[in-house]
Structures are given as structure tokens and as C-alpha cells.
């Protein structure tokens, strides 16, 4: 009795704990979303998820438990079974008592069948049949359980998880093969099957409960697909096979596939569970015989079988549309075999499945125990399975190998063209402006001076060496860290931009110069990394009350070098002359770049939650041998206030010291979810986000509140899909992507705003309809921030990867892969690696002004010469435009690998690099940049020197290559001067004829 009460109290305690935990999560989320201004977004998602879970779990539970309860009523009672079988056994001879004996005749079977009963099953048939059905039940549980676990522990956005293939007749074998190839799953499924055979009633009901939770979970996490279905936006473009608008495949088909996944599993398990209930009734296994299905049992199974066949027909109806994702042919999407053979087969299977389903349901409604057409059901199902196997799998394979492959190009030409066209549409490649670029090799010193802005922005400092230098010179304390350095451009007053001449022989500046100039810079945030705090100092107060924020940033021009080969800084240090402000290189920089009080409460590595406005002052920044302290006065955070809120957040954060600390005040706030990625992920989980948030120093008013705070994070967000018809997916399974959203996060206040960057994207239009007011037009972004938007690296990388194949628009060239491209390699440090896209300020060919672009060169497959380069524009009206410059194929244009080889083969350069590498240091070859200037290409590579003991990279040399000339000098200016200096032609020798026989005297 005592233990029973202990068990009950434990159950009550666990239930109360779960209830409190759920309530605290819900309450904290409501407070947090209200703080960031997106409470309506959260509530709509919450209601949608809750309704979907309740509907899916409830319908599944009612259907499965209801049918299992009905089966319990209709199954053979134990007493009837024992009496009948034992009476018949008593009449048998001793030699016939073994039901497995081949001498046992059917005439000796139990006489309990009336005219409506089906024939009995003996043990040699009953046991394998029951075991196979039990294995199927275990396979269903494991399969759908794996899907649910994939949603619980995703590696990417939950809403973007693909719908895994449901239980279709032709795929059960493949699913079984995959699962049974793994010993763990094999043992689990066999164990479930044996448990069902022994304790059928308990385990069949338990599996029904688990599947109800699983199906509820699957629909819970697919709330985005459901909402998109009800708010579709037309693409105004049709796919060629069925003539449907693309929106059907993006918004409608995923929901139908989700329903198929759910209902197919529910109906299939229900049919299997009820069949097992009947087969295992009356202790049939221990008695060695099943008396046969009674008329009531048959009627029940007919009804459930009819629903199952209805889903099978629906599955084949969906399979027709899924042919546009077929990988069978030479190109992605429906191929010749799919259209000519597979599509008619799916149509036939759909119609036959409907016919069988309607017949079974008609027999269920208008039941007759004695029917002369009863055997037609088995014939029909047998014929259906034959068509599925023979026509659904064998026939398409025969056609593919015997008809298509011998004449593949002729058969597949139309379908290849579809793949090319729709892949280019899906990845935004059809709008690329392709031009011819024919390098002339006539670049002169005058041309270099005419392109002074381009030269002044050639990037000599890469992110890696600059970050290493920052960590040595600008961190100041162990708990500060520079997690990243980002390329951007700023408009500076001319005084700030004119610290260094572009070349040694540059003419003096004219009397009238431009008031401002754009400079390419590397900006890095100085964030607080609490994990770097000494272990002895990692106390609760330090973690949550004192070490709350980072401070400041560094800004370095990309092309200038300070004393000793170290980078120069426009902005650096902490605690300048203006009470905690940062140090600047000049007044012009201070006037050009707003600094204010650059506290970073929200950043890339701010992963701890903190409490502000307490009795404990926050560490602001180090000042000499002491520290400066401050209290947060921003708009972020949630007021803890009363005791119940303190308890709520203590429960939510699992931080019980919050309940007992005496440092809280009535105005104390809690700031959590401070990492910018997790912050925007929580608000908009239906978007994908760029991997590189970048810091911007600008005046964001009036869109962002807050005085004297000018630091913002900008993040690019993408709308993606894997359901675009005929579009060949990339390595991540994405076959549609748009950079539709720009996100701005206030680094001090935590405010988040979403701006639509591509209003032509139907997916973002759908999300705008679902969440009205969440997205703002890009024109609402402050101009000071808008001037810093850039073409995102991740988006450009995906497009450039697809372009390597899908620049070929001719079907025969595409089929033969005659013009396949690749991304060239470069040497970085001492290792070869693919060239990464890089930003630069330059003027594109035929464009009369400089602009901020993202560039990537291409080489032909398995060759090293340049074949093209892709440029993405980032400024003003030209933002988002792609330009592809193709080089003449009949002319050699040096690629990065060829230039690297020439650098390493040059005796002077290679000797110097080898000398550095032998003196306790290491020479690092930086990024090799291919820079278009007018109608020529200039190659620039910095060389850094790094000590093996102390990693402080310094820029020691710059290598410049142009045409057949290559120069290594201490500065870019010297290298340019050397490579473009006029070649001195020696004076011809004076040759006089010497006449034989003459002498000076003569």
C-alpha cells in the first residue's frame, strides 16, 4: 500500500512538474515575443501548431482505438475457441493430433465454419502470416518514429524537412531493406513483432497511442506547409507536363503529401492491427489453428481495406505529379520513360485502386455474407499487385534500357530543355546578363591612375590574418573576442581616405577634390566571450550580472599597411578621449563613422542570458589597470518585477538562484536569446539565414529607437523550396531560392526588423499574407543602413555552383557536358583550396563608375585557364543584378592556378618564400584576386609572414601579375610601378665596317 501511494505521488509530481515547465515556457515566450514586437506571429504559430497536433493525434487515436475496440468485440471469444477446437481434437486419431503433420487432412479441420466463414488457417500458415503482419506493424512504428525524431532533433529549419516517402506498395520493400540492413533497427522491429505475438492486445493499443503522438508531432512541425496552402501566391509560370502553375507544387502538393504520409500510415496500421487482433484471437497460435474470419470480421476488414485502398489510389494520383522530381533520366525531372510509360501506369493504378476501394466500401455498406463475387476481391488484389510489380517497376526499366538509352539524346531532348529552363528560373539564373570580355593587355600607368578608386580598394588584408592581428592587438582582455571580420564599404571624408597614395608616382592632388570617397573596409565586432573568463571567476553573478556585453569594433582599410607590416585602423582601441568612445585615426573618420557608445548586448557569440538594472554594476570596458562600469538603459529585455515573474523565468531558464538573489530591483530586466541567429530563427523559423551576419555602424533613426547607439547587425534571409518542378537541386536538396529578406538587428536594444528585398518572390508574398505587418518594404529601411546591404555570399555561392552546369542552354552541349565549368583553385598558406567569392570596388567593363561587387572566376572542367567570371552588383538601383563575362575560348586567359604556378616557379619569389619558411616563421600566400580594370585583368596576391611561435601575421610583400609580367614588391604601389614602368630599350651598337689591309697610317 505504501509503495502504491509513493507511485501515485510520483506520477502527480511528474505531472505537475511537466505542467509548470510547459506553462513557464509558454509564459516566457509570450513575454519575449511581446518584447520584440512579434507576439501576433507567435500566437498564430502556436494556435496553428496546437490545432494540427490535436487534430492529427485525436483523429488517429479515435480511428485506431475505435477499430481496435470494435475488433475486440468481434473477435472469437476464448471459451468458444477452446470448446470447439478441443471437441474436434477429441475426435481425431492419435496420428492426426499434430496440426503440422502432412497427414493432417483438411477434412479433419474444426467444423465451426458456417457458409459465411473463410477457410481456417493452420499453424504452418498462421504463424508466418501473423509474424509478417507483426513485422509490418513494427516497421511502421520505427519508420514514422524516425521521422518524428528527425523533427525533434533537426539540423536545419524544421519547416524545411522533406516529406519522407510514405508506405506505398512499391516502396515497402525498399524501406524494409534499408531498416533491416541495420542491426539495431532489425533487433528493435523483431522485438516489437515478438511482443505483439505474445501480448497482442496491449502492444497493439500501445503502438496506436505512440503513432497518435507521432502523427501529431509530424503535423505540428509542418504547420508552415498547412498555412502556405491556405495563402498561395501564383508564380504566373506553368510547368510543361501538366500545365499547372508552379504554385501548385510549392504550396499545394506538399500538403497533399503530408496528408498521404499521415493517412497512409494510419489506415495501414489500423488494417494490420485489426487483422492481427482477429488472427491471434482464441489462442490460435497455441492451439495451432485459426478458425477463419467470421462474416462480421470480414465486413470490418472490408471497410478498413476500402479506406486503405482509397489512400493507395490517392498515393498514385500524387505520384503522377511527383514525376517532375524524377531522377531517372539524363536530366532531373520527368524523362521520356516517366512521361510515356510511368505516367500511364500511375493513371491505371489510380483508377484500379479507386475501383477496388469503392467495391470494398460498397460491400461494407451493403453487406451480404454469401456473395458470389467474394472471390473477385482476391483476384482483383492479386492482379493489382501484379500490375504494381510488373508494370510499375519492370516495364519502365525495360523501356529505359532498350528504347531510351540507345537513342538517349533524341528521346530526352525535350525533357533536357525543360530541366535547363526551369532550373535557371528556380535559381534566378535566367536574368543573368551575359557578355563577352576580351582582355586586351593594353593597361598602362595612365589607365591605373584613371582607375584610382579601384586601385585604392584592392584588398590586401584577408579576414584570417586581420582577425589574428586583432586578437593580438585589440582584444585587451581574455574575455573579449573577434568572432569574425566582414567586408563592407563606407563613405568617408576625403581627408580620411587620402592617407596613402595609390602609387608612388601619383601626381599631387588637385586643388579641388571630392568631398567624400568610398572605401572598402574590414569591420570586426569586439564581443564578450564568457567561456574565456578564467574558471575561478565563472560565478553566477559574473556570468549573469557583470559580464553582460561586448564593447566596440575595429575598422581597417583593406589596402593600407602600417608600420611593421601591421594593418592600419580607422577605428580601434577602447576608452579614447571621449569617455569610453573608440579611438579613430582622424577627425574625418570620426565625422564619417558614427560611434557613440558602442555596447554590444546582442551579437554572434552572446549565448548567455543576463539580468540588467540590478544592484550590481555591469562591466563596461577596461580602463587602464581598472574597469569602467555601467548599467543598461536600452529598450531590450523583459522586466522581472514581481515574485511570480521571477519564478516563471527561474523555471524557464532552470536557474533557481534567481529565486534567492537579493540583487534584483523592481526595474531589473532579463535579456535572453541574445545571439542574433537564434533571435531571428525564433521569430521566423520558416526562413533560411545567411551564415555570415555582418556589423554596420550607421545612424538607424528613425526606424530604430535609441540614442547614441549606432551598431546594427544585418542578416540576409532566403525563401527556399525543394518542390520546384524540373529544377535540379543543389547539394543541400534545395531547388528554389531567393534572397527575399534583409534583417536588421539593433546590437544594443535587440530590436529586429524584416525588410522585403525581392517583392517578386511568391513565397515571401505568401508569408506576408500569413503574417501581415511582419515585413516592411525595403524602401522603409533607413538610407544610412540601406547603403550597406550587399549581395549575400551564400546565395551567390549557390547560384555560381548551379551556373557551372546550367550556363549551357543548348541541349546537345548540355547532354555531352562539352562546356562544363568549375571553380578554380588557389594556394592559401601552403594548401590548395577553391577560390571563394570576394567583394571589391571596381568599375565593370563598359560601366563608367565604380561600384561594390561580388566576383568569382570560372575555369573549364579539368583545365586551369579562365573561361568566365560572374559579378553580382550591390549598389543602388543595380542591386541584385548578375553579370556574366565570358572569355574567348580561342584565347588563353591565365587562371588562378596558372598564376600561382608562375609565382611559385619564379626563382626570386620562390627563393624568398623558402628563406622565410626556414627562419622560424611561415610565409602565407593570401587570397589571389582577379581584378578587372577596363578591358584587362590584374592579379594581386598578398604575402604574409607569421612567426611559428607567436601568430601575429604581417604583410611583407605584394605580388602583382599582368599578362606575362610578374612582380613582388613591399607595397602595392611599388609593384604597380614596377610592372607598368616603360621598358628601357638599349641603344643599338655602333657598327663600323673594318676594311682589310688598311692601317691608321694609310
From Swiss-Prot:
Pfam families: UPF0182. The keyword Membrane applies. It is a multi-pass membrane protein. One of its GO terms (cellular component) is plasma membrane. InterPro entries: UPF0182 (IPR005372). It comes from Nostoc sp. (strain PCC 7120 / SAG 25.82 / UTEX 2576). The chain crosses the membrane at residues 7-29, 49-71, 123-145, 178-200, 202-224, 258-280, 300-319, 339-361, 382-404. This is UPF0182 protein alr1037. Keywords: Cell membrane, Membrane, Transmembrane, Transmembrane helix. Its main location: membrane. It is found in: Cell membrane. Belongs to the UPF0182 family.
Amino acid at each position: 500500500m505504501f509503495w502504491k501511494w509513493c507511485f501515485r505521488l510520483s506520477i502527480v509530481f511528474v505531472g505537475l512538474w511537466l505542467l509548470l515547465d510547459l506553462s513557464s515556457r509558454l509564459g516566457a515566450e509570450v513575454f519575449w515575443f511581446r518584447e520584440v514586437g512579434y507576439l501576433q506571429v507567435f500566437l498564430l504559430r502556436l494556435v496553428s501548431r496546437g490545432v494540427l497536433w490535436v487534430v492529427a493525434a485525436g483523429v488517429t487515436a479515435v480511428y485506431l482505438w475505435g477499430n481496435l475496440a470494435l475488433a475486440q468485440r468481434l473477435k472469437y471469444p476464448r471459451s468458444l475457441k477452446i470448446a470447439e477446437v478441443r471437441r474436434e481434437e477429441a475426435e481425431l486419431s492419435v496420428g492426426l493430433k499434430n496440426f503440422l503433420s502432412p497427414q493432417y487432412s483438411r477434412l479433419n479441420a474444426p467444423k465451426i465454419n458456417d457458409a459465411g466463414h473463410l477457410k481456417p488457417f493452420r499453424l504452418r500458415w498462421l504463424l508466418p502470416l501473423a509474424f509478417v503482419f507483426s513485422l509490418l506493424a513494427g516497421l511502421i512504428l520505427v519508420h514514422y518514429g524516425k521521422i518524428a525524431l528527425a523533427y525533434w532533433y533537426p539540423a536545419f529549419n524544421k519547416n524545411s524537412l522533406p516529406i519522407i516517402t510514405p508506405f506505398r506498395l512499391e516502396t515497402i520493400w525498399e524501406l524494409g531493406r534499408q531498416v533491416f540492413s541495420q542491426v539495431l533497427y532489425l533487433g528493435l522491429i523483431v522485438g516489437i513483432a515478438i511482443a505483439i505475438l505474445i501480448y497482442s492486445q496491449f502492444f497493439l493499443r500501445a503502438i496506436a497511442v505512440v503513432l497518435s503522438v507521432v502523427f501529431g508531432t509530424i503535423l505540428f512541425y509542418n504547420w508552415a506547409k498547412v498555412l502556405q496552402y491556405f495563402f498561395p501566391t501564383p508564380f504566373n509560370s506553368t510547368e510543361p507536363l501538366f500545365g499547372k502553375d508552379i504554385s501548385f507544387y510549392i504550396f499545394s502538393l506538399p500538403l497533399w503529401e503530408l496528408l498521404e504520409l499521415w493517412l497512409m500510415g494510419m489506415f495501414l496500421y489500423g488494417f494490420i492491427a485489426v487483422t492481427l487482433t482477429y488472427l491471434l484471437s482464441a489462442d490460435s497460435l497455441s492451439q495451432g489453428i485459426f478458425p477463419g474470419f467470421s462474416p462480421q470480421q470480414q465486413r470490418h476488414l472490408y471497410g478498413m481495406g476500402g479506406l486503405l485502398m482509397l489512400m493507395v489510389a490517392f498515393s498514385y494520383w500524387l505520384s503522377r505529379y511527383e514525376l517532375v522530381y524524377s531522377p531517372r533520366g539524363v536530366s532531373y525531372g520527368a524523362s521520356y520513360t516517366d512521361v510515356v510509360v510511368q505516367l500511364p501506369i500511375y493513371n491505371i493504378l489510380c483508377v484500379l485502386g479507386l475501383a477496388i476501394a469503392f467495391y470494398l466500401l460498397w460491400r461494407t455498406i451493403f453487406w451480404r455474407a454469401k456473395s458470389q463475387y467474394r472471390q473477385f476481391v482476391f483476384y482483383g488484389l492479386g492482379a493489382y499487385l501484379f500490375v504494381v510489380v510488373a508494370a510499375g517497376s519492370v516495364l519502365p526499366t525495360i523501356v529505359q534500357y532498350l528504347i531510351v538509352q540507345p537513342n538517349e539524346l533524341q528521346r530526352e531532348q525535350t525533357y533536357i530543355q525543360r530541366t535547363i529552363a526551369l532550373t535557371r528560373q528556380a535559381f534566378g539564373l535566367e536574368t543573368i546578363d551575359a557578355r563577352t570580355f576580351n582582355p586586351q593587355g593594353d593597361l598602362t600607368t595612365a589607365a591605373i591612375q584613371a582607375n584610382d578608386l579601384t586601385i585604392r580598394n584592392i584588398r590586401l588584408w584577408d579576414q584570417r590574418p586581420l582577425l589574428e592581428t586583432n586578437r593580438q592587438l585589440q582584444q585587451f582582455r581574455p574575455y573579449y573576442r573577434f568572432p569574425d571580420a566582414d567586408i563592407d564599404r563606407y563613405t568617408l571624408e576625403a581627408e580620411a581616405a587620402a592617407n596613402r597614395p595609390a602609387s608612388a608616382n601619383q601626381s599631387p592632388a588637385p586643388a579641388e577634390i571630392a568631398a567624400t570617397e568610398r572605401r572598402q573596409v574590414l569591420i570586426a565586432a569586439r564581443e564578450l566571450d564568457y567561456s574565456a573568463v578564467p574558471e575561478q571567476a565563472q560565478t553566477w553573478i559574473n556570468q549573469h550580472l557583470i559580464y553582460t556585453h561586448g564593447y566596440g569594433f575595429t575598422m581597417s582599410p583593406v589596402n593600407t599597411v602600417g608600420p611593421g607590416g601591421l594593418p592600419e585602423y580607422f577605428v580601434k582601441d577602447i576608452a579614447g578621449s571621449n569617455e569610453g568612445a573608440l579611438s579613430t585615426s582622424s577627425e574625418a573618420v570620426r565625422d564619417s563613422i558614427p560611434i557613440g557608445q558602442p555596447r554590444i548586448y546582442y551579437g554572434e557569440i552572446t549565448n548567455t542570458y543576463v539580468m540588467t538594472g540590478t544592484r550590481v554594476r555591469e562591466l563596461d570596458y577596461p580602463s587602464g589597470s581598472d574597469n569602467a562600469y555601467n548599467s543598461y538603459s536600452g529598450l531590450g529585455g523583459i522586466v522581472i518585477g514581481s515574485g511570480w515573474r521571477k519564478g516563471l523565468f527561474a523555471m524557464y531558464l532552470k536557474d533557481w538562484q534567481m529565486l534567492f538573489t537579493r540583487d534584483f530591483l523592481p526595474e531589473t530586466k532579463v535579456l535572453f536569446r541574445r545571439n542574433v541567429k537564434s533571435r531571428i530563427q525564433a521569430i521566423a523559423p520558416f526562413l533560411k539565414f545567411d551564415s555570415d551576419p555582418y556589423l554596420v555602424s550607421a545612424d538607424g533613426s528613425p526606424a530604430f529607437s535609441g540614442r547614441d547607439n549606432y551598431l546594427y547587425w544585418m542578416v540576409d534571409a532566403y525563401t527556399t523550396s525543394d518542390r520546384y518542378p524540373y529544377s535540379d537541386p543543389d547539394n543541400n536538396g534545395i531547388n528554389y531560392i531567393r534572397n527575399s529578406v534583409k534583417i536588421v538587428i539593433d546590437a544594443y536594444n535587440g530590436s529586429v526588423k524584416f525588410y522585403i528585398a525581392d517583392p517578386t518572390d511568391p513565397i515571401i508574398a505568401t508569408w506576408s499574407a500569413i503574417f501581415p505587418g511582419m515585413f516592411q518594404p525595403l524602401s522603409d529601411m533607413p538610407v544610412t543602413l540601406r547603403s550597406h546591404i550587399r549581395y549575400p555570399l551564400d546565395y551567390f555561392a549557390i547560384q555560381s555552383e548551379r551556373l557551372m552546369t546550367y550556363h549551357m542552354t543548348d541541349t546537345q552541349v548540355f547532354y555531352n557536358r562539352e562546356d562544363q565549368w568549375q571553380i578554380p583553385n588557389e594556394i592559401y598558406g601552403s594548401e590548395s583550396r577553391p577560390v571563394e567569392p570576394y567583394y571589391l570596388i571596381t568599375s565593370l567593363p563598359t560601366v563608367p563608375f565604380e561600384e561594390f561587387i561580388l566576383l568569382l572566376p570560372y575555369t573549364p572542367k579539368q583545365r586551369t585557364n579562365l573561361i568566365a567570371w560572374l559579378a553580382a552588383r550591390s549598389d543602388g538601383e543595380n542591386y541584385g543584378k548578375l553579370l556574366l563575362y565570358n572569355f574567348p575560348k580561342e584565347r588563353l586567359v591565365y587562371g588562378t592556378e596558372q598564376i600561382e604556378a608562375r609565382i611559385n616557379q619564379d626563382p626570386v619569389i620562390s627563393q624568398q618564400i623558402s628563406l622565410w619558411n626556414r627562419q622560424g616563421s611561415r610565409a602565407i600566400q593570401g587570397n589571389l584576386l582577379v581584378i578587372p580594370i577596363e578591358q584587362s585583368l590584374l592579379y594581386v596576391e598578398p604575402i604574409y609572414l607569421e612567426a611559428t611561435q607567436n601568430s601575429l601575421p604581417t604583410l611583407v610583400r605584394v605580388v602583382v601579375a599582368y599578362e606575362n609580367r610578374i612582380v613582388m614588391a613591399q607595397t602595392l604601389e611599388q609593384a604597380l610601378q614596377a610592372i607598368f614602368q616603360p621598358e628601357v630599350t638599349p641603344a643599338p651598337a655602333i657598327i663600323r665596317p673594318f676594311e682589310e689591309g688598311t692601317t691608321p697610317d694609310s
